[in-house]
Amino acid sequence: LIKSPPASGKSRALMFIALDKLANQGIKQAIVVVPEKSIGASFNDEPLSKFGFWADWQVAPKWNLCNSPGTDGGKVKSVTAFLESSDQILVCTHATFRFAVEKIGVEAFDDRLIAVDEFHHVSASEDSILGKQLNDCIARDRVHVVAMTGSYFRGDAVPILVPENEAKF
């Protein structure tokens, strides 16, 4: 869980975490999930090695689905193609991720990092599709989840995750 105020470096912190997980922790791919397309720009290429890190954050243009034209249906096909590829980083919206999980199932994301920006948009409510999908992923214990938010609390009384999954953070 990365909880920090807006514009304080959560996206940059995730880049370091994801690159380490990809290189050293057996994770196949990193999927960054953002609430809207404009936030996807926070995850554009970054020359981290310029500042002493051992790798750079690089997202192939075709895998930053926030910058690509098309409908969610076409983007779901792109998510599927990404999962079948050897490329390592994908950026997409919450909606695209939800539709992809609905189509191909949570099992398709095994052994991957799922990083969810603006995590407070998730809810344990049965009405929250993204919340249910993330709870299912966490319950399978086959994915690494990084939650990023400025505030871990929602404005309503609904918890973000079910208690047994929240305890895993």
Which ranges hold each PLM region?
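Walker A/P-loop
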Residues: 1-17
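Conserved H-loop
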Residues: 7, 35, 150-151
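Conserved Walker A/P-loop ATP-binding site and its immediately adjacent core
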Residues: 11-13, 22, 26-56, 96
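Alpha-helical scaffold elements adjacent to nucleotide-binding pockets in ATP/GTP-utilizing enzyme cores
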Residues: 13-17, 42-50, 114, 129-133, ...
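Switch/connector loops and helix/strand junctions flanking conserved nucleotide-binding motifs
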Residues: 40-45, 99-100, 123-124, 154-159
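Inter-Walker segment of RecA-like/P-loop motor cores
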Residues: 53-99
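SF2 helicase catalytic motif II
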Residues: 94-96, 105-147, 151-152
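Interdomain helical connector at the RecA1-RecA2 junction of SF1/SF2 helicase-like NTPases
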Residues: 144, 156-169
